[in-house]
Amino acid sequence: MTSPSSSFWNTASREAMKSGMFVAKVYCFLHVTTNYLGFMAYAYGPSMIPTLHPSGNMLLAERISKRYQKPSRGDIVVIRSPENPNKTPIKRVVGVEGDCISFVIDPVKSDESQTIVVPKGHVFVQGDYTHNSRDSRNFGPVPYGLIQGRVLWRVWPFQDFGPLGPTPT
């Protein structure tokens, strides 16, 4: 015969085990989803005007295509900043490996331009609003390994919910 207290502890330990397994499954699902399939990205600031709002956007980005295909001109990508690895800016791909890119170095201060060839395994990224954007004009071409994902949809603000096309609007 089991005492009421041992029955309580048996039931409590079974429930704790069930809850722990549920939490572990949810954690594994979220880990696989965000590291291999897609993730939510937050973009704010003026560098992608008019495509994105400077006051903030929630975007859905996918990670699958970066494993199977190279980025294309016009794609909006989330990158790991070459200058500060804690930041993940969102920029548009304007040049792929082998492209010859001419750009104005600092459009606010001068008309001085520079031309570079994008090296193999790199992309040239730029904000849509070039007068206020830190991008490949500042830190050079970005290696494929720093691309975190490709932006597919704007989720917030709700009035602009929908897919983001490959070219500026």
UniProtKB/Swiss-Prot annotation:
Pfam families assigned: Peptidase_S26
Q: What is its EC number?
A: 3.4.21.-
User: Does this UniProt record's set of keywords contain Nucleotidyltransferase?
Assistant: no
Q: Where in the cell is it found?
A: Mitochondrion inner membrane
Catalytic center at which residues? 47, 91
Q: Which UniProt keywords apply?
A: Hydrolase, Membrane, Mitochondrion, Mitochondrion inner membrane
Query: Belongs to which family?
Result: Belongs to the peptidase S26 family. IMP1 subfamily.
Q: Main localization of the protein?
A: mitochondrion
Q: Which GO terms describe its molecular function?
A: serine-type endopeptidase activity
Query: Which InterPro entries does its entry note?
Result: LexA/Signal_pep-like_sf, Mito_IMP1_subunit, Pept_S26A_signal_pept_1, Peptidase_S26
Q: Which cellular component terms (GO) are annotated to the entry?
A: mitochondrial inner membrane; mitochondrion
In Swiss-Prot or TrEMBL terms, this protein is called: Mitochondrial ATP-independent inner membrane protease subunit 1b
- State how it assembles: Heterodimer of 2 subunits, IMP1A/B and IMP12.
Q: Name one GO biological process term.
A: signal peptide processing
Lineage top rank: taxon: Eukaryota
Functionally, this protein is described as follows: Catalyzes the removal of transit peptides required for the targeting of proteins from the mitochondrial matrix, across the inner membrane, into the inter-membrane space.
* Name of the coding gene: IMP1B
